[in-house]
From Swiss-Prot:
Naturally occurring in which organism (per UniProt): Anaeromyxobacter sp. (strain K)
Pathway(s) it belongs to: Cofactor biosynthesis; biotin biosynthesis
EC numbers for this chain: 2.3.1.47
EC top class, as a word: transferase
Catalytic activity: 6-carboxyhexanoyl-[ACP] + L-alanine + H(+) = (8S)-8-amino-7-oxononanoate + holo-[ACP] + CO2
InterPro entries: Aminotrans_II_pyridoxalP_BS, Aminotransferase_I/II_large, AON_synthase_class-II, AONS_Archaea/Proteobacteria, AONS_Proteobacteria, PyrdxlP-dep_Trfase, PyrdxlP-dep_Trfase_major, PyrdxlP-dep_Trfase_small
Identification of the protein by name: 8-amino-7-oxononanoate synthase
Listed Gene3D superfamilies: Aspartate Aminotransferase, domain 1, Type I PLP-dependent aspartate aminotransferase-like (Major domain)
Keyword field contains Transferase: yes
Subunit structure comment from the entry: Homodimer.
Amino acid sequence: MARGALDWIGAELEALDAKGLRRSLEPIGPAQGPVVQVGGRALVNLCSNDYLGLAADPRVRAAAADAAMRFGAGSGAARLVAGDLPPHGALEARLAAWKGREAALLFGSGYHANAGVPGALVGRDDAVFSDVLNHASIVDGCLLSRAELVRYRHCDVEELAGLLARTRARRKLVVTDAIFSMDGDAAPLRELAELCDRHGAMLYVDEAHAAGVLGPNGAGLAEALGVQDRVDVHMGTLGKALGAFGAYVAGERRLIELLVSRARPFVFSTALPPPACAAALAALEVVATEPSRRTHLFALCARMQAGLARLGFDVARVASPIFPVVLGTEVRALAAAAALRERGWFVRAIRPPTVPHGTSRLRVALSAAHDAAQVDGFLAALAAVLPDLPPAEPRRAG
């Protein structure tokens, strides 16, 4: 029975409908892969973050199944109570070695890590400097820290330099995505590291969309640019390129020891399930022994980038498997996604507040499980649907 106290929700949902901003869930199956079943149809999946195609890899699945039988389906408690099981420590040691750091700490999700770590490092007398296009979880973590939040223009090192020079904050924390999740471009980590060195600021890098994909060992953008030792806080996820679930922070041992006591999402959450840890360990072994997956992925990326550029899309700065097909209005993005689905392509419309008004888009994501024919097929389908989309409207401010 509906309760009167919630009657206001109906009007809120109608307002979301009117703006083209109402979300809904849509199951896929049977598992992640380059082709999935959606609504009873087989569609090529171009909106997953399973960049290396490991979520359904038999070795990764077998490791998870074995861990479930050995250690149980769940951890049963927080790590600090009775939930610290052997797979947790084994995965943390492997992650620390992979990232070239002294230690690592697991979190329940990337959102958990980003929401909790800033507050363990800074507070009321401090300042956090955050790229304006950082992920929502970073923004929320900065706000929860109660430090002054200073947002600088996207990848604008000069503006950040001025802000750091003028601040009187006790502690300074610069936070950035490595790869920006909606645009696919890379942060200028070398320049950011130089600024942080000069101004005595801590550097926090979210490698969610870079770890497993970039660098000689797949360890991320910091490895690719040779600045691993100059990043204080390495955050990454286990649920994207590694195909599992959860997240981690890697860094100096004293940093990890502080987070064990002060990172509230770690302290007050049940530990990651052992099967997720085992799956991530198996995925890390594949990353180490099969660099051909990354080579194949970036060959596909070059093909997609060239094709989208021919269609007139601005993808010159893309440095990842993420391609923004910016269409402008919510209506155009939704229409494009629907038309592509009719042709056999599963790609989502991304709308405000995920992206700024006037920049609604298709977020196209490639996987090492795709092939060149699928890239070419998508480009042909996109070219076919573009002329029939609703007309573009002037971009709104904000």
